[in-house]
Design a protein with these regions (language model features):
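Alpha-solenoid repeat junctions
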Residues: 44-48, 74, 78, 105, ...
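Alpha-helical, heptad-rich or low-complexity scaffold/stalk segments
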Residues: 30-96, 103-107, 330, 427, ...
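Alpha-helix N-cap/helix-start positions at coil->helix boundaries
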Residues: 34-35, 49, 64-65, 80, ...
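Amphipathic alpha-helical scaffolding segments comprising HEAT/armadillo-like alpha-solenoid repeats
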Residues: 18-28, 48-60, 79-91, 111-130, ...
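Solenoidal tandem-repeat scaffolds enriched in leucines and small polar residues
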Residues: 132-139, 164-170, 174-183, 194-208, ...
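Bacterial N-terminal signal peptides
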Residues: 6-14
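Terminal, low-structured helical/coil segments at or just beyond the last alpha-helical repeat
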Residues: 416-437
Length: 437
């Protein structure tokens, strides 16, 4: 039995519900078509990028198994030439198609992402899709990587109106990884979904994009009943420096259900840099909770009140908890101690770049401190005899906060005999050039 022309035209006009069979397959028997087309796509995939134009039409096939085989083939091939086809696949109404297309798009701009994305955890029962999201969500492309507008548009639309909550949450994660600023309205709308996973992924994406204009749209979640969502909202409020939310953060501190929420609220308040909160920071600097001591020190660091220097000096010398001591070192340096002696706070921060457990904390503090030209001048001499981890860590810091005076030092790292240092230096110099006018 062959397909009639009216049926073929109808399939084209309604491809969102029933994508059309590629013309070259239209005259084959219906029962045999599916298996033959699946095999055909698999055979094409082995030809690499040259097969992309031939595979793409199968994304509009009437049979889902064929469309899935096509998007899998595109994911496996990878590379910029698959982008247009994957954007088309992301518009499919099936959630698995949306998820596979999303991960494939991210993989183009962050090679290797398919191994860490949720695609490998997918399970399907009929139209129901289940996926396992990892708790680690710190990936983000380098700032010099350019992502075409249609990619961000389709991912934003999926985060707002995907076929399943899993595909929406996955798209929100992808928007964050790709720094999709244009999709912020979609992420803010996703915050109203009442689904904890989707709300959390949307908040983390907003954090990565770092657009302060999004701050007010997050404030309503500062008292959310789900602790994970509430903490993400608190962190986002601090990162985006939403000053209008300061009263809400103070209430959260007073009424926090857990110590973890209180710590995050004090930390977020510390990012807002309001002198009215100095008393709060001084109080928590001596708290028995090391996380609260750390947040108190960070708040005083950003206020830069000279009267707090002796208090922070004393706290730094007495502190034994690594996390809190790093925050106190940050505070002492912020208030003007730029010495680079063996036991000085600034040297302590640089030394901590060698610690796998606390490297990220040290990079964050040094990034903030290095916006001050005097701090940069203090650390430049260290780079000549630094360890590999110190060189790569400071390379990241200078990429984010350096200025023209940082170029010669990054140039030196680009020429470093250590391949790892050279690679990080090359990326960092490119990031710096992208940032600077």
């Amino acid at each position: 039995m062959t397909r009639s022309t009216p049926l073929f035209l109808s399939a084209i006009l309604t491809f969102a519900q029933a994508p059309a069979v590629p013309p070259q397959q239209a005259q084959q028997p219906a029962q045999g078509d599916t298996k033959q087309r699946v095999r055909a796509v698999r055979d094409m995939a082995g030809k690499g990028q040259d097969a992309i134009p031939t595979i793409a039409p199968y994304l509009r096939d009437i049979d889902l198994s064929v469309r899935l085989e096509a998007v899998k083939a595109l994911d496996d091939i990878g590379g910029p030439k698959t982008v247009d086809a994957l954007v088309e696949a992301a518009r499919d109404n099936d959630p698995e198609m949306q998820i596979r297309a999303t991960d494939g798009l991210v993989n183009v701009y962050m090679p290797g992402y398919l191994k860490t994305g949720i695609t490998g955890t997918l399970s399907r029962a009929g139209n129901s899709i289940r996926a396992k999201f990892s708790d680690t969500n710190d990936q983000v492309i380098d700032s010099y990587v350019e992502v075409p507008a249609p990619v961000i548009q389709v991912l934003g639309r999926l985060s707002r109106a995907g076929a399943s909550l899993e595909s929406r949450a996955n798209a929100a994660r992808a928007v964050g990884i790709l720094r999709g600023r244009a999709a912020i309205p979609d992420l803010l709308e996703a915050l109203n979904s009442k689904d904890n996973r989707l709300m959390y992924e949307s908040l983390v994406a907003i954090q990565k994009i770092r657009d302060p204009a999004a701050g007010p749209g997050v404030a309503f979640l500062l008292r959310d009943l789900d602790e994970k969502v509430q903490i993400a909202a608190i962190q986002t409020t601090g990162m985006l420096r939403n000053m209008s939310a300061a009263p809400d953060l103070r209430q959260v501190i007073d009424r926090a259900r857990t110590a973890k929420v209180r710590r995050e609220a004090v930390s977020a308040l510390a990012m807002l840099n309001d002198p009215a909160d100095r008393g709060i920071f001084l109080r928590y600097l001596n708290d028995k909770d090391d996380g609260l001591r750390a947040s108190g020190a960070e708040g005083l660091a950003r206020l830069k009140n000279p009267e707090d220097r002796p208090v922070l000096d004393k706290a730094f010398e007495a502190e034994r908890n690594t996390n809190a001591r790093l925050s106190m070192a940050f505070g002492v340096v912020s208030l003007g101690n730029l010495q680079m002696s063996e036991f000085s706070p600034l040297q302590y921060l640089v030394n901590t770049l060698n610690s796998k457990a606390y490297r990220g904390v040290a990079i964050a503090f040094l990034t903030e401190l290095a916006r001050d030209p005097a701090v940069r001048q203090a650390v430049y001499p260290v780079l000549t005899h630094a360890t590999r981890d110190e060189k790569t860590g400071m390379s990241i810091v200078l990429a984010r906060s350096g200025e023209r005076d940082s170029e010669p030092y990054l140039d030196a790292l680009v020429k470093d005999p250590d391949p790892e240092v050279m690679q990080e230096g090359t990326k960092s110099l490119r990031t710096l050039h992208t940032r600077l006018p």
